[in-house]
């Protein structure tokens, strides 16, 4: 997507946005103000492998998959689309990982850095 606005309304559930300085995010490139990641690109993992940590607020079982609503603190809530049924309970630790190739990077104005560098 060209910008955060477009990224936010394409897809269901919508893309997650996390400020790069947020305590739950273990690392991010220096020139990025916010990352975007789609719920289907987040994977529940062990704490040792986690790139992101949160607490489960709610889980919605939908047959082939479950939607996990995760509190990262600081008024940031994200959604993860987990395969299969889940036995996770409210309040459970939610260490998550993702493929960095699936991240979308946005500058402070919400413009995709992939787009801004592609047009220079």
What are these regions (language model features)?
Residues 1-11:
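Conserved beta-strand-loop-alpha-helix hinge in the C-terminal portion
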Residues 13-16, 23-120:
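Non-catalytic connector elements of ABC transporters
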């Amino acid at each position: 997507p060209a910008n955060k606005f477009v990224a936010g309304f394409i897809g269901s559930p919508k893309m997650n946005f996390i400020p790069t300085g947020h305590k739950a995010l273990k690392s991010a490139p220096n020139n990025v103000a916010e990352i975007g990641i789609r719920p289907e690109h987040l994977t529940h993992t062990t704490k040792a492998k986690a790139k992101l940590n949160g607490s489960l607020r709610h889980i919605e079982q939908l047959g082939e998959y479950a939607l996990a609503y995760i509190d990262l603190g600081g008024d940031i809530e994200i959604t993860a689309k987990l395969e299969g049924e889940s036995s996770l309970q409210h309040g459970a630790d939610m260490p998550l990982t993702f493929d960095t190739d699936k991240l979308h990077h946005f500058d402070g104005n919400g413009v995709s850095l992939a787009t801004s560098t592609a047009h220079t």
